């Protein structure tokens, strides 16, 4: 496993006034293939981002469409170098499935880390505007009624009640490799993670379809392009007894698709099952390749990670939250390249995909 980050230790205040040791990741990919996957903002670019964010005045939670539309317009004011790099990533031909952005303005007066994802705390911070401006350079922001309460920005925080779950609220078990919403034809094209508070033990794992293909035989690649796997709906979508137009079990579907030199991947270690013994064994081959070749990064405050949900899978390590108000706190949002693909599942001028269409 390659590690994308080096660490330096610093002391950050607890909400109680005590101190706690955390780690900050520095801009240091350890091998050349990942170097192009980092965008480091200069101090001038960060200042411009902070200034442009003031143009976004709508409420991120209660006026989500207006908020996103304002961010789309304001994004034209961002530095051309930043916009060009984000658009290059969005186009995708040369991306490795992720882009790490460093040097975002630090959020002052950050509220305590919430203990659940109910209250959309991240949406009330300046980070939501920074994140939206960057997101809207890549595509159009979208939300899902059945995921994170339909919030445009979801609080990714550890929950004591969900510590052992295969969801973003877990911490006591490794979050296994997955495509975000692998089961849904309306899944996001990109996942956006902005760090408000970090944890040195919480690593985000990344593994691209290109990395996978490089480990496989021609026969294995051909098999992965056949519809030989089923998947079920994610646990986080099943609250409130929801039903779905496509049912609970989906497929069979292929794991790989797209161009030979730019493959797409759909995978979920927890939810996918092969329809035959060879398919099940090949699924295990994919998992073994992930553990051997994945890269990792420890997100720190002022960093944002964009994941191309078509070209890469991701996961997260085990970590040990204290539930003291100073735990890991990420803001997650979703982006699509083409908003019209989900228009039938959203209300007029709405940004939220209705649960039954997921």
From Swiss-Prot:
Q: Where does Fe cation bind?
A: 178, 180, 314
For this protein, what is the EC number?
1.14.11.-
Source organism, top-level taxon: Bacteria
Tell me if Iron is a UniProt keyword of this record. Answer: yes
Tell me its applications: Being totally regio- and stereoselective, this enzyme is of interest for biocatalytic purposes to produce chiral scaffolds that are of synthetic value in the preparation of more complex functionalized chiral molecules such as natural products and analogs.
Residues noted as binding 2-oxoglutarate in the record, renumbered to the chain: 328
* Cofactor note (record): Binds 1 Fe(2+) ion per subunit.
Q: Which GO terms describe its molecular function?
A: 2-oxoglutarate-dependent dioxygenase activity; iron ion binding
Q: Which Gene3D superfamilies match?
A: Clavaminate synthase-like (3.60.130.10)
Reactions performed catalytically: L-lysine + 2-oxoglutarate + O2 = (3S)-3-hydroxy-L-lysine + succinate + CO2
Q: Which UniProt keywords apply?
A: Dioxygenase, Iron, Metal-binding, Oxidoreductase
Q: Which cofactor does it need?
A: Fe(2+)
**Intrachain disulfide bonds:** none
UniProt keyword DNA repair present = no
This molecule's function is given as: Alpha-ketoglutarate-dependent dioxygenase that in vitro catalyzes the regio- and stereoselective hydroxylation of L-lysine, leading to (3S)-3-hydroxy-L-lysine. Can also use (5R)-5-hydroxy-L-lysine as substrate, but neither D-lysine nor L-ornithine.
The record's comment on protein family reads: Belongs to the clavaminate synthase family.
Q: What is this protein called?
A: L-lysine 3-hydroxylase
Look up and give the organism this protein is from: Catenulispora acidiphila (strain DSM 44928 / JCM 14897 / NBRC 102108 / NRRL B-24433 / ID139908)
């Amino acid at each position: 496993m390659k590690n994308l980050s080096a660490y330096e230790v610093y002391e950050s205040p607890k909400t109680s006034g005590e101190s706690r040791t955390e780690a900050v990741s520095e801009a240091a990919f350890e091998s050349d293939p990942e170097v192009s996957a980092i965008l480091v903002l200069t101090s001038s670019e960060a200042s411009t981002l902070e200034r442009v964010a003031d143009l976004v005045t709508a409420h991120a939670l209660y006026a989500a469409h207006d908020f996103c539309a304002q961010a789309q317009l304001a994004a034209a004011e961002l530095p051309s170098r930043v916009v060009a790099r984000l658009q290059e990533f969005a186009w995708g031909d040369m991306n490795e499935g992720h882009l790490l952005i460093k040097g975002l303005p630090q959020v002052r007066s950050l509220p305590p880390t919430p203990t659940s994802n109910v209250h959309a705390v991240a949406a009330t911070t300046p980070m939501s505007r920074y994140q939206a401006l960057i997101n809207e350079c890549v595509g159009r922001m979208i939300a899902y009624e059945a995921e994170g309460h339909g919030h445009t920005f979801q609080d990714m925080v550890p929950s004591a009640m969900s510590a052992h779950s295969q969801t973003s609220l877990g911490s006591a078990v490794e979050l296994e490799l997955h495509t975000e919403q692998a089961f849904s034809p309306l899944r996001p094209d990109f996942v956006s993670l902005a760090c408000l508070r970090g944890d040195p033990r919480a690593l985000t794992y990344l593994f691209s379809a290109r990395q996978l293909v490089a480990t496989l035989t021609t026969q294995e690649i051909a098999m992965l392009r056949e519809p030989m796997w089923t998947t079920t709906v994610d646990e986080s979508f099943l609250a409130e007894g929801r039903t779905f137009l496509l049912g609970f079990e989906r497929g069979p579907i292929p794991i790989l698709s797209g161009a030979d030199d730019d493959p797409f991947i759909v995978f979920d270690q927890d939810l996918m099952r092969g329809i035959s013994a060879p398919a099940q064994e090949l699924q295990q081959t994919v998992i073994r390749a992930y553990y051997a070749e994945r890269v990792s990064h420890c997100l720190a405050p002022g960093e944002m990670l964009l994941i191309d949900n078509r070209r890469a899978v991701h996961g997260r390590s085990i970590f040990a939250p204290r539930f003291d108000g100073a735990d890991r706190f990420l803001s997650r949002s979703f982006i699509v390249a083409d908003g019209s693909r989900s228009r039938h599942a959203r209300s007029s001028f709405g940004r939220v995909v209705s649960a039954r269409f997921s």
